[in-house]
Amino acid sequence: MTFSTTKSVAMSPDDDAPSFDINSSRRLMSHSEVESRGNGYEVLQQAGTVRILLSRPERGNALSLSLAKDLTQLFQTFSSQHSVHRIVLTGKGKYFCSGMDLGEELYEDATERCLALQDLFGAIDACPKTTVAAINGPAFGGGVGLAFVCDIRVAVSTSFFCLSEVKLGLCPATVSRFIIREWGVSLARMAMLTARKIHPQALQEMGVLHAVALDEEALKVVTENLLDDLGFAAPQASAWCKALTRKTRNGNSDHDQFARQISETMVAPGSESEYGVAQFRRGRKNIRWEQAECLHTR
């Protein structure tokens, strides 16, 4: 089996250099039992990883108003939990997410639906945890936004992304912000105007999809290997990386001041770096941060 790959920013356990070798067959993590269920989703947690599974396969995992609100609450809750380091979002069945549920009262709830989507994408975008979209199938409309608001995206080769709203006399008003940001103006505009399917291989070449797996089983391997790499990334340092990215992306003039604040904080007594550098000096180059003593004394 073959995969298309890119490199990640985390160290592999056997090398000093960053690596994202998804051709290797690392041990698949055994998932815990379902922690909770809601109307259209399931939540599983193991160690520092939370998995959110969209579970409306009969509706293409479409986002109902209630599901959008529930997902927002989940991301807001996990954002404040020290035990959570990563959040994986994926779908059950054929589709990743087919967008907003058009079977609901579209016109009566238009404003509420727009606000619910804005809140959802805002909660994911602002989440200090590393977010991963494991895209198991096609995504339409809001589902495309759901994938590309996440930090890292891996997809099965049979997936595609379609901003099909224009065919219905609509436009992807809420998700366009994130699609334009991640895809660039030219591709995003073409995709919105033509409603053409955008295939994962093209997005991988652009660097906005970070791995493409041959099939769904291979996607599981890709995802677990990525999570294994991310296990070596210190959680607070990861949150700072995301915060710096937001500052730069938004063109904030206070980026340098913010960077100085982080530079001082990250070397303070009791910080992750105090532990990490001490371990490095002892010859231990890779730390499983879920097991790090410094995190358990907080």
UniProtKB/Swiss-Prot annotation:
Keyword set includes Nucleus: no
UniProt EC number: 4.2.1.-
Keywords of the record: Lyase, Virulence
Pathway named in the protein's UniProt entry: Mycotoxin biosynthesis
InterPro entries membership: ClpP/crotonase-like_dom_sf, Enoyl-CoA_hydra/iso, Enoyl-CoA_Hydratase/Isomerase
Job of this protein: Enoyl-CoA hydratase; part of the gene clusters that mediate the biosynthesis of the host-selective toxins (HSTs) AK-toxins responsible for Japanese pear black spot disease by the Japanese pear pathotype. AK-toxins are esters of 9,10-epoxy 8-hydroxy 9-methyldecatrienoic acid (EDA). On cellular level, AK-toxins affect plasma membrane of susceptible cells and cause a sudden increase in loss of K(+) after a few minutes of toxin treatment.
Natural source organism: Alternaria alternata
Family classification: Belongs to the enoyl-CoA hydratase/isomerase family.
Additional comment: Gene clusters encoding host-selective toxins (HSTs) are localized on conditionally dispensable chromosomes (CDCs), also called supernumerary chromosomes, where they are present in multiple copies. The CDCs are not essential for saprophytic growth but controls host-selective pathogenicity.
EC top class, as a word: lyase
GO molecular function: lyase activity
Region (Disordered): 1-23
Record's protein name: Enoyl-CoA hydratase AKT6-1
